[in-house]
Each structure stands twice: as structure tokens, then as C-alpha cells.
Amino acid sequence: TALRKYIREVGDLPVNITFMMEGAEESASTDLEKYLEKYRDDLLPADLLVWEQGNRNSKGQLEITGGNKGIITFDLSVESADVDIHSKFGAVIESASWYLLNAISSMRDDQGRILIDGIYEKIVQPNELEMNLIETYAIENADSLRRIYGLKLPILESDRRAFLKTYYFEPALSIEGISTGYQGQGVKTILPAQSRAKMEMRLVPGLTPEYVLECIKAHLKKEGFDRIKVTFTLGEESYRSDMSDQAI
């Protein structure tokens, strides 16, 4: 619609534009990579990629996003015995639940900082222009998050500059879900034999899914949680646009 209006009111376009439409984002875009490889020679000469979403922020303003965090998702699992054990042995037998919870707790502190060696050392720090842009235009803040999502727990970072730097330019480790033990009605006094967790880390430039996966495995081994099985499930690298580029 915008292009039709431009051509109608102004005339010929001053640039060449190629449209690419993909409708499977919510199901992980499983065929997108094949498509890009097939048409790489047609797409690579482009000077600029614009991923149009049409999102508006809470002020009703259209936004330009100069990058996206990447992601690695992975499963953690552990088996502590052949069968669930009566909880009377809880003083002398380790359960899969505690073992997994302790392993996860070793990976992040209570302020959200990742404790895995090699993560922060690799990230590409924001430059002065990037920090100035988010301080000037970003509207995310601790109070708005409390209001929008009805937060019940303390927010991890309330100072505005630190909040924005962490939110935009630092990785984040999250638990997507945990499955362990009895979840039915009433009580079942057991030490669960199996525990699983679905995890993710949001990535920033400098971190690749492959590198982070090896850091996670090395961390668990170093901390004494070598019985944890780590299963990679998804990985995508981040990107950050050069906001000083003439095209932008």
C-alpha cells in the first residue's frame, strides 16, 4: 500500500525492492533456511533488509528495531534411581529434583547475572551511539513492566540506564518449564527418580548457540553436575544493525 501510494504521488522508486513473505514464524520457520539458501544469489546483493512487522509501542508509535537477540534452547535432565524412592530416605539419598534444581541455581545468581564462565567475556559491548539511541528513544522501564504484567516479584534492575543496557545488550538465562515428581492431588511422599527442565538463553552479538552450549556443558561438569544430560533443541544467532549506516 505504501509503495503504491509513493508511486502514485511521487513517481518511480529510487531503489530496487524485493519482497519476501514467510508465514511460519510462530512454528519456528523450519523451512526458512532452505528458502534463503535456494535464493541466496538473489538476496545477498541487497544493501538493507527491512523486516516489516507494523508493531506499535504502548504510546501508539511505530518502532524501528535495529537488531534482535538470538536464542539457544536446551533441555536438562537427570535420573537419580531406577524408581521413585520413599521420602524417608531423604536425609541420606539425593533426589533428581534437588540435583537438577541445584544445577540450575549454579548457572544464575539472584540478580539475573549468568554465572557460566565465558559468557560475558565474549559479548560485543554497545557503542556510544547505540547507548544514546536507547536512552533517548526506548520507552521500556521497570514501572511500565510492573503495570503491564502485574509483576508480583521484585524486578531485577530498576536503574534506568542499567535496565536498558541489560535488556537490550546482555544475555538472559531463563527456565521455560520444570517437570519433576508428583503433581497430582493430595500427597505422595517420594524422592523423584527423574527430573527435567526446559531452558533458554537469549543471545547477543559475540555469542553463538554452539559456543554457549559448550560453555553450559563445561560449567555443569566444573560445578560437579556431570550427571546432568544436556540436549540442544534450537539455536539462532543474534544480529545488531550498524545504526550509523547511511541506509538506516
Role assignments for model-derived ranges:
Residues T1-G67:
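Acidic/histidine-rich catalytic neighborhood of metal-dependent amide-processing enzymes
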Residues P45, T65-S80:
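Internal, well-ordered domain-core segments that constitute the primary functional module
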Residues R56-N57, T73-I248:
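Metal-dependent amide/peptide-bond hydrolase catalytic core
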